[in-house]
Amino acid sequence: MATNLTSLKPPFKVKARYGWSGQTKGDLGFLEGDIMEVTRIAGSWFYGKLLRNKKCSGYFPHNFVILLEERLNSSTENGRQPSKIVESFEKSNKVVIPPVPSRYSDERPRPKKKLSSSMPNSPKKPVDSLTKARKAKSKEMVNEKNIYNTQSSRHHNNSAPNLPLASHSKPQVRNFEESMNNPLPPLPPLPDLDNMRKTDKRAPKKSYSANDLHMARSSREYNYYKDNQKFYDGFIPEKRYSLEEDSISSGLFSNSQYLNDSACSSENSFALMSDFSATSAGSFARHKYAQSFSDSLQRSQNANGCSTKINDSQEFGDSNASSRNGKMGDILRKIIIPKRNTNIYSSSVSSPKSPKAYPKLPDIQNLNLSATPDEARDWIAVKCHLNRARTLTKYDKHPRYMRALEENRDLILHPQDSIYNGLNTNEVKGNTKPGLVDVELAELNIEYIDKMTWKRCIRDGTMTLDSWAQTTFSARYSTVLEKLRGIYIFCTEMFALTDDNGTSDFSAEPQNLEKILYRKHCTPYELTWLFKKLANSLGITCEIVIGFLKTPSAINWEFKYNHCWLRILVNKEWRFIDVILGNVTNPIHEFVNNRKIKKAENSYFLMAPLEMIYTHIPPREFEQHIVPSIDQLSALYLPLVFPSFFKNELKLYKFSTALSFLEDSEIYECSLEIPNDVEVFASVVIPTDNEEASSAYRNMELALTQIKKQKAESGRRIALIKAVLPPNVNKGSLYIHSGVRGTQTSIANIHPLSMMVPLTHKGSNMKYEFVIKIPSESIQKIELYIVEPQSRYLFVGNEYSFEVIQSPSDGIVYSSDEGPNQNRKQPMAIKSPSGRVHELVKSDPHFPYGTWKGSIKIKEPGVWSALVIADSGIGWSVFAEWLCV
């Protein structure tokens, strides 16, 4: 028996016929047999809460539940009903779940022809014909028994969906039997996620722009599916311009075409290794050195030039004229899109039906931030720049996570979790514990072994490879570690790498290795095999691994064969050696260190598996030598790191790959955990062949690194890194350098490259730069975190609130008994271009550290500087600069 939804008056209780997990965040999932109290009806959907847990509430489809009715004198039917239900289960082999209804109400017609034609795997019988057949059959069954004629005619309505009742009636048993025998209908359209997000009463997003209007969004979604029709099995939705017609079919997520395109074995033929030589020896030759070194050097040379900063202010206005459609902050969001109730009907009544009903907005096209002083004073421009660099909260990050996952289903949001969870360890044999090799390496006299290797490695060309290895490395090398070190120095310092130009046969052992032994140059593949043969001659277990090496300026989340390295069993512990990257002639060292090296890179000698997995991805999981093994996708999405990342004991603290896919006015943000004696600097490098554009990018402050807090558990510091791409730039890279604290005294990077993060951007963007942080030798005892303003540009005629947090560099606050000099008070101030000093006021004058604040009316264009008393207590030191335009 069925009832019309329009005749129901909430609240009432329903019981779940099937279990349902929900589709969106606002849905209510339940188990079979759960009882819910319905408080609202929205079309074919109910809104209610679970009676067993009233904290859980949300939307759920009406045809997954049955209405609970209190009936009297139904004990006779209750005794007969279970047997018939059991019979119906015996007649059918499987339970057919009813289709999930559309979230649209019946008053809103939706186009279905385009949707059904775009579904490749749609059933032959449409949904409408199924529903008509079911209605016809139900009518026949109602006519068979006159008992139910009255109730059927009372509740029958063709325009509204029907709800099954929990009454023990014979026609209902027949309907249940037939519903189980019917084929599974096609999945309904997915809910309108954009509309659901608008009704979600959470913290607002960071900033919004005119692109948030429905017309621009629908056009953007149409272009997105059109460009990615191969991923979505050719699905291209209709180009819609109204919110009511916006719908997405779950049929577009068919796996057929996607699996055909992506199905490939990790053990492919070695013919795929056509670019092996490019990453082994010659790929970094064209880079010479990381561009972040030269960019930072040029910025430091131009830091004192006033003309450069005036030109920057002019370029700032020009770039804003070309990209005026950036996000304007939360205030526009509140004006353009009013708050709506979660009820669909109430929101449709309260919301304006046309754009004319909204309050009149300022013309966004006239938002030229610095063309004239009058426009620069505009409060929208000021708020936009102040709020853009605001630190992201979990509510800001979550929509970006969901958007990235929608665009790439294979994306791993937090790949570092598989390494830092404490479960994965380096593989060892027997009952030994991992890490004993590191202890032996610390006690190894490396300088003595390296000098002895240079003296003993005499290649006269008279002995075979095995006899030469046993003669050279057996007498004076007492342990396995010393023998491996000797072979490593021989291969990395006494051979020059040559490019094979793709001629190496990686499926077989290189020929004439004994002749190569007495030469001074070889290809990367030959050098790897030479190390293996020498180690095997000394009885050391050593095997070659051919896999994928992550490289700069490449797509590193797609596996391909391009590199080879060695896995070695030493003292019952598996370690890795890469003689190609450790070789002194490899151009990668000049790229990372900004100079050539004369000694072999020690980081690639007996590298731990948990460190090797960042850059070297083997095709088979057992070759990782990590217990338990790490998923290959997680390893591919780990950031590209270099030896100084592990030398300086850096660690990913809050890192997400989804945040690197920028849209409109978004910024990138990540956090690193660093020791107290290490400093970190970052810069953004834009690849371009245009010299004028490259010079302009060098002078821009596109990254900001600050020490945010001290981690209480470990005593280590948290470095917060933010980055942004300039206007009209789609791709760039974030370069992170690290080194000993206090050694870098200018903006020019002197520390080696530690980490690279690729950044992409789409949509509109306004020019934005971060405040210039200036390192100084005289400020080493305290850490200064600029809360606001973090933007580089200030606008004349506006009042700004300056806020700086001062904390001890070692994280220790001494008591008064330990001496007053331990907690020296270091006041701060803001200096105007004319030389006037505005002192900042401390929030808690009795506490040695804390927050310093001050509100200043900006009236002078030029460079504004942040000052702090030096550690010696004599004189001011500049630690930050802003540019007023």
UniProtKB/Swiss-Prot annotation:
Compartment(s) of residence: Cytoplasm; Bud neck
PROSITE patterns recorded: SH3
Sites bearing Phosphothreonine, chain numbering: T391
Keywords: Cell cycle, Cell division, Cytoplasm, Phosphoprotein, SH3 domain
InterPro entries: CAP/Cytokinesis_protein, Ig_CYK3_C, Papain-like_cys_pep_sf, SH3-like_dom_sf, SH3_domain, Transglutaminase-like
Function: Involved in cytokinesis by recruiting INN1 to the bud neck. Cooperates with INN1 to stimulate the synthesis of the primary septum (PS) by CHS2.
Family: Belongs to the CYK3 family.
The name this protein goes by in its record: Cytokinesis protein 3
Source organism of this protein record: Saccharomyces cerevisiae (strain ATCC 204508 / S288c) (Baker's yeast)
Lineage of origin: Eukaryota, Fungi, Dikarya, Ascomycota, Saccharomycotina
